[in-house]
Regions:
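Accessory "access/gating" subregions that flank catalytic or transport cores
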Residues: 192, 200-201, 207-260, 352, ...
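Glycine-rich phosphate/diphosphate-binding loop of Rossmann-like nucleotide-binding domains
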Residues: 11-34, 150-222, 234
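N-terminal glycine-rich phosphate/adenylate-binding segment common to multiple enzyme folds
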Residues: 50-157, 243
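Glycine-rich phosphate/nucleotide-binding loop
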Residues: 46-49, 108-110, 115, 229-327
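Internal helix-turn-beta structural module
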Residues: 306-360
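Buried hydrophobic positions in well-ordered alpha/beta secondary-structure cores of metabolic enzymes
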Residues: 17-20, 68, 133, 174, ...
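N-terminal beta-loop-helix "entrance" segment that forms/cooperates
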Residues: 37-59, 226-228
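Short, Lys/Arg-enriched N-terminal segments with co-localized hydrophobic residues
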Residues: 1-7, 358
Length: 360
């Protein structure tokens, strides 16, 4: 990896707040083993508020818009709770500016970490490897809303609205992802009640005709929530609307035993945004206790989805699997001896370097 050179793949790194700089450093260790990347660090979130008063300074925004990918570590913390502009607002602004309409959230239970999953052994033993594909810019979170008074009582309303175009583009992304996995999609809706879900189902069915090799199943959201706990192995790609995906992706993440393990990608425009799903964890900041795996796997997703570097992405996953076979941060230790964030990063980077040499 080189900094600032021309003709490179340009990555903007947003270390952010809390444990962000600690876990970002581990991802940089891994990225530095690859050639052809230029890394540019920018202020974002609470640290940017401290310097500029804005969670997303214009310089950071312009750098992100001009980059090939954005890698974000963590944002927010209680220090900025009383600020007029919260750090999290910067994340919403960044996603909007990057035109990210799809959120990808994988949830995997690793063989060596089965015992820290809250699920029963007989359920975990079937295997869990799910990709939640959530529509990110439409639906009830962005619909018309308001409050009023009727017959002396206050009321409030929120409106779910989806266009055929919004549904089609997220469906096509989900089907394209399914083609590279086990060719199975479960589309989640509430078509027995909601008109927006009936349109959702209709459009997804139409898109599926262009992907005859992918098996499509529909499931009501209440049943999907139950099935995720009862038998998550039945799912591969879960396609959902914004609100349903918000809920189901968090549910799926808890099956793994630690949110520190999980990456995510927000895609749609030219530039993808990649980040672990956990927060800034101010309670362990500076104590070398953070789990960097979600951050490193976010880097792996970046290589896959922004640069079509499937081989390197797979080797990062293998490096992580090898690391947790012999070392654990405290959140996944399960009573075993734990290592710190920095040491875990060294182990993963060492594994990755070895795998790169062997896989030629």
């Amino acid at each position: 990896m080189h900094k600032g050179r021309q003709n490179m793949k340009n990555i903007v790194l947003l270390k952010g707040d809390g444990i962000g700089p600690e876990i970002a450093a581990q991802a940089v260790k891994v990225l530095s083993l690859l050639k052809g990347f230029a890394l540019q660090e920018e202020d974002f979130g609470g640290c940017a508020i401290d310097k500029t008063g804005e969670p997303l300074p214009n310089g950071t925004l312009q750098a992100a818009l001009g980059a090939d990918a954005v890698l974000l570590a963590a944002v927010g913390g209680p220090k900025w709770d009383a600020c007029p502009k919260r750090p999290e607002a910067g994340l919403l602004g960044l996603r909007s500016a990057l035109k990210a309409y799809a959120n990808l959230r994988p949830a995997v239970i690793y063989e060596d970490l089965k015992r820290i999953s809250p699920l029963k052994d007989e359920i975990v033993s079937r295997g869990v490897d799910i990709m939640v594909v959530r529509e990110l810019t439409g639906g009830i979170y962005f619909g018309k809303r308001g409050r009023g008074t009727e017959d002396g009582a206050e009321y409030a309303y929120d409106t779910e609205k989806y266009s055929e175009k919004e549904i089609e583009r997220i469906a096509r992304m989900a089907f394209d992802i399914a083609l590279k996995r086990s060719k199975r999609i479960c589309s989640v809706d509430k078509a027995n009640v909601l008109e927006s879900s009936r349109l959702w189902r209709s459009v997804v069915n139409k898109v599926s005709q262009d992907y005859p090799e992918v098996k499509l199943e529909h499931m009501y959201v209440d049943n999907a929530a139950m099935q995720l706990v009862r038998d998550p192995s039945q799912f591969d790609v879960l396609l959902t609307s914004n609100m349903f995906g918000d809920i189901l992706s968090d549910e799926a993440s808890m099956l793994t035993g630690s949110i520190g393990m999980l990456p995510s990608a927000s895609l749609g425009g030219k530039t993808g945004l990649y980040e672990p799903i956990h927060g800034s964890a101010p309670d362990i900041t500076g104590r070398d206790m953070a789990n960097p795996i979600g951050m490193v796997l976010s880097l792996g997703m970046m290589l896959k989805y922004s640069f079509n570097m499937d081989r390197e992405s797979l080797l990062i996953e293998k490096a992580v699997r090898g690391a947790i076979a012999c070392a654990r941060t405290i959140d996944i230790s399960g009573g075993c001896k734990s290592v710190g964030c920095d040491e875990m990063g060294d182990i993963i980077a060492g594994n990755f370097e070895r795998l790169l040499r062997e896989d030629v």
